[in-house]
Amino acid sequence: MPSKYLFTVIIPTYNCCQYIKKALDSLLLQNEYFLKTQVLIVNDGSLDNTKEVVSDYLIKYSNISYFEKTNGNWGSVINYVKKNKLALGQYITVLDSDDYFLKDSFKKVARFFGHDMIIGAFYCYINENKTRFLKPYFGKTGVIKEHTKLRTPHSQPIAKFYSNKLFYELHDLKEKLFFQDCLMYHDAINRVESVFYLREPLAVWFSTRPGNSTTTSWENPNKFNAWCEILQKMNLYGAGIVIYIYTMLPGFLKQLKKKQLILNLNHKPAYTWLPKPLAFIFGGLMAFKTRKYIKYPK
């Protein structure tokens, strides 16, 4: 029996009571699509008053559900939803509680149902005076036929819609480990047959929120060690572009130098996300800049 929900929105939240209201209000802005959307708020052991903030929404809207679990980081929330088979929508997306959708984004996405994934562009909020429009892929709106082009560094969960079937096929994620959204995205790309790219802004990603994985210092051993592990897996997934771009982040490179560590990869990274001329130039430049810190068989 088909689900009555077109969409499921999973909202992982940890100590984000001051942001989650904006995330929920953005779902109300989906107008007629809001009531066709299942909303799953999963409180990952917050120590703030998140439950009180969302209580009015739970009373007013029957399509919004709230769950509490012990803290296990982002990946544990996705595992929790899958294990308990909570997500019922035809398409499933993850909205971090400090991000939000733009008005009528779901209406735009629904026009392209039928693909394994539908992926949109989004805005990156930096501060009150600066917002950047991020386009995950090169090219125009349409089906992406070359799946190597999907190995984008923009693997944030924002504006990515997984078919229900694909979502439940994905590997379980590691708990208590940063950057599991990268693995979720690239795992999905390994499995998809059809991906539609909507080159329109659908949402806003709050990249600079204090305390998130992006702004946490690279001196944090949990973040640093997690990223070393993630880079190994990105290479196995063929996402060499991710390896080089993030290795070049000043804080990460500084820690590699400080710890005198070398990333040993099983093969040379690929840069297939880029157009061929750029891939050649970028690959050569990055290989030179990281030659002391990334090694692979000749």
Swiss-Prot record:
Domain of life (superkingdom): Bacteria
EC number, as in UniProt: 2.4.-.-
Keywords: Glycosyltransferase, Transferase
Pfam families: Glycos_transf_2 (PF00535)
The keyword Cell cycle is assigned to this record: no
Gene Ontology BP terms: biosynthetic process
GO molecular function: glycosyltransferase activity; hexosyltransferase activity
Family: Belongs to the glycosyltransferase 2 family.
Name of protein: Uncharacterized glycosyltransferase MG025
Organism whose genome encodes this protein: Mycoplasma genitalium (strain ATCC 33530 / DSM 19775 / NCTC 10195 / G37)
